[in-house]
Amino acid sequence: MATGKILQITGVVIDAEFPADSLPQIYNALEIPLGQGRPSLICEVQQQLGDSVVRAVAMSTTDGLVRGMDVINTGAPISVPVGPETLGRVFDVQGRPIDGEGPVGTTKTMPIHRPAPTFEEQSNRAELFETGIKVIDLIAPFTKGGKTGVFGGAGVGKTVIIQELISNIAKEQSGYSVFAGVGERSREGNDLIHEMKDSKIPGTDQTVFDKTVMVFGQMNEPPGARLRVALSALTMAEYFREEGRDVLLFVDNIFRFTQAGSEVSALLGRMPSQVGYQPTLGTEMGELQERITSTKTGSITSLQAVYVPADDYTDPAPATTFAHLDATISLERSISEKGIYPAVDPLASTSRILDPNIVGEEHYRVATEVQRMLQRYKDLQDIIAILGVEELSDDDKLTVSRARKLERFFSQPFGVAEVFTNIPGKYVAVGDTVKSFARVLAGEFDHIPESFFFMKGRIDDVVAAFDASKQ
C-alpha cells in the first residue's frame, strides 16, 4: 500500500501527493491515520489532478487534519460488511457499526462501487407486491423487484409511509429490509430504530429490527458520506439478492443523495448545470438506480422517499428520479390538510403494473372506476363552490356522495402512527381492498354516512361502526 502526503485541505476536500508509480485510482479509498486512539479518516478519490496529485472527498469531518500528514492508498474502494450478521445492526457509510453493540460477526465485505447486473442476469417478470396499504395496493401497486417513489413536500408523511411498510413487510412477509437514511433528521432515525425494536413479529420472539439492516448518513454528516451512504446500503441489499432472497431497500431521502452530489460537485470545482445542480446528475442517479433491480436469483424491491423542493415537480432532482421508477406515489398537501392519511393523491399516483394482464380484470376495473369517480368529483367542485350541492343533478349528487366516501375510505390507521392516533394499525390484503371498493362503487353502502368510512381498514369495520352507532 503506497503512502502519500496531504498537500491541501479545503473543507472536506483533500489534495494528496503520491509517488508517480502508485497513483490511486478513481473511487479508491484513502486512509488517514489520526492517532490518539481515534479511528482513521477515510476519503474517496474523485479526481487525478496531474503531477501525482489526487483530489479526494472525506467521509467524515476533517477537523484536526494538517498538511504533511500521511495518506495511505488502500488500493480498493470503500468496502462494507455483508451477510445475515448485519441484520439488527446500525452502520455508517463505511460499514462501521454505530449502535454500540460491538464489532459485526462477519468477515465478508463487498466494495460499494459495483457494476449493475447485465441484461442476461436481469429478470423481466412483472408481479404485484402486497403492502397492506389500501390506496397503494389499489391505485399504484408495487412491482416485485421494482422501484417506487414516494413524492411529497415537507411534512406530508413520506417517512411514516416508509416506516409502516418496513413494519408490514417484516410482520406479514417475514422479509429482510435494508434502510438507508440519506441526509435526513437524526431524530427520525433514532425514533425509527426504537419503533422497530418495540414492534414484535407475530408468532415469534423477534422484532422488526432483527430483520432490518440500517445504514445512516444523516444531515449533520459531510456531503461525501451523504453521497455514498445509499451505495453502502445497496451493496448490503445486493448480497441478500445474490443469495436468492427477495429484499426490500428503503431510501429516505433520495433527494438528499442528489443534494450531496451537488455539494461535492461544487467543492470539486465543476461548473454547475441548471438550478445549480451538478452536471453529472443523470449519470450519478443512473449508476445507483440501475443496480436496484431483479435478477434470476433474487430481487431488490425499492421504495424511495423523494422530497420535492417547494412542491415543484419540475425541479431537476425529482424530475430525474421520475425516469427510473415503476410506480409513483404522490402525497398531496391538500389531502393531508383534510386530515386524510396516508395523504396519497389517487389521481396523480401511477403504476406500470396497473394492467389487467398482471393485476387481473377486477382489480383494474375497480381502480379505474374509482379514479373516474374521483375525477368527476374534482370537476364538479367549482360548481359546488359557486352554486352548492343542491343544484347538481341526481346522478352527480350520487357521484359526489360516493366519491367523498371513497376519499375517506382511502384513509387507514397505521401501526407506527398508533401513538398519535390511538387507533390500532390495520393491514388490508389486496383481495379485501378490491372487494371493499367494488362494493362502495356499487352503492351497497349509500345509506352509511361518510364519517363512518374515515380511518377504517376493511369495509366490515365501517359496517360494524355504523351498526354500533345505532344501538
UniProtKB/Swiss-Prot annotation:
Its EC number is 7.1.2.2. InterPro entries: AAA+_ATPase, ATP-synt_VA_C, ATP_synth_F1_bsu, ATPase_a/bsu_AS, ATPase_alpha/beta_chains, ATPase_F1/V1/A1_a/bsu_N, ATPase_F1/V1/A1_a/bsu_N_sf, ATPase_F1/V1/A1_a/bsu_nucl-bd. It comes from the Bacteria. It is an enzyme of class 7 (translocase). Keywords: ATP synthesis, ATP-binding, Cell membrane, CF(1), Hydrogen ion transport, Ion transport, Membrane, Nucleotide-binding, Translocase, Transport. It catalyses: ATP + H2O + 4 H(+)(in) = ADP + phosphate + 5 H(+)(out). It is found in: Cell membrane. Disulfide bonds: none annotated. NCBIfam families: atpD (TIGR01039). This is ATP synthase subunit beta. It comes from Herpetosiphon aurantiacus (Herpetosiphon giganteus). The gene is atpD.
